[in-house]
Amino acid sequence: MMDSPKKLGYHMPAEYEPHHGTLMIWPIRPGSWPFQGKAAKRAFTQIIETIAEGERVYLLVEQAYLSEAQSYLGDKVVYLDIPTNDAWARDTGPTILVNDKGKKLAVDWAFNAWGGTYDGLYQDYEEDDQVASRFAEALERPVYDAKPFVLEGGAIHSDGQGTILVTESCLLSPGRNPNLTKEEIENTLLESLGAEKVIWLPYGIYQDETNEHVDNVVAFVGPAEVVLAWTDDENDPQYAMSKADLELLEQETDAKGCHFTIHKLPIPAVRQVVTEEDLPGYIYEEGEEERYAGERLAASYVNFYIANKAVLVPQFEDVNDQVALDILSKCFPDRKVVGIPARDILLGGGNIHCITQQIPE
């Protein structure tokens, strides 16, 4: 048993620190990406092309789909033939840590499709559970095996200076690590991520089927500086959830003892829902969670991705699209802030941050 990453001097950098590259997965799952994923593939392509302007993109695509992916992307990416069950690189890819000598260590968490037998979203996730170790092997990076601890990359945010953000709704969900206490879960995070402090937010985004990942509700934009998904509509269930998160953040400090600057990022003014027109496009396997007409989707501008040269922000053809871009442009003056039409990713159950995973420099 190797020492914990913390004992070995590794830590998880912030997403806004320099990247070597980004990991993504080609979207092919028929129960996630309707109508053969055609619209999703166009959205993924726009995201990949934007990220690739400033860093390498590694794309996991099985041999059977390689020529299709190449028809969209040509030689813009590094293709790796690693099998997956779906395209959520944030949640199935490794969490890559660094030490002060610039060495990397890939953390391999257990993955159970956001809840396993309790409330997981599909039953066969065996390939997904191998993605982190197989990708690390392809990159020739050493692996820290954190299994059987269940965690997804979307459930954690790091400031690179010892602070980790999580939500209680996700990490304490009975479908993750039901036999561990909150204290044991926190200790595992600190040791595995080389961190000093975990901040437990009560909630994420309403009806987020990941049990409310933190990456949809709060994100670091700099040291001691965060954005928080917000609504002023007191009749929206999201209002009480965001308010509880705000109250906690206002009284908390980061690992260095600094209070947070908090920017409120509005959620879309119009609720994003699954329509009757979307439904015929999905093909489900047995035991897979199915969509229904009118289902509210967990749309949030906080699910942006910070690449080396750009910040990629979901857009929903909503009045708040530009508001979100303006706020984030002030947070990231040195990067191009790019709006990406994202409803076709949202229909799969996540957004831009959920399909990307940074590989630190």
UniProtKB/Swiss-Prot annotation:
Taxonomically, which superkingdom? Bacteria
Output the Gene Ontology terms for molecular function.
agmatine deiminase activity; protein-arginine deiminase activity
Sorted alphabetically, which InterPro entries does this protein's record hold?
Answer: Agmatine_deiminase (IPR017754), Peptidyl-Arg-deiminase_porph (IPR007466)
GO BP, sorted A to Z = putrescine biosynthetic process
Which keywords label this protein?
Answer: Hydrolase
Q: Which reaction does it catalyse?
A: agmatine + H2O = N-carbamoylputrescine + NH4(+)
Active site positions: 354 (amidino-cysteine intermediate)
Protein name stated in the entry: Putative agmatine deiminase
Q: What is the lineage of its organism?
A: Bacteria, Bacillati, Bacillota, Bacilli, Lactobacillales
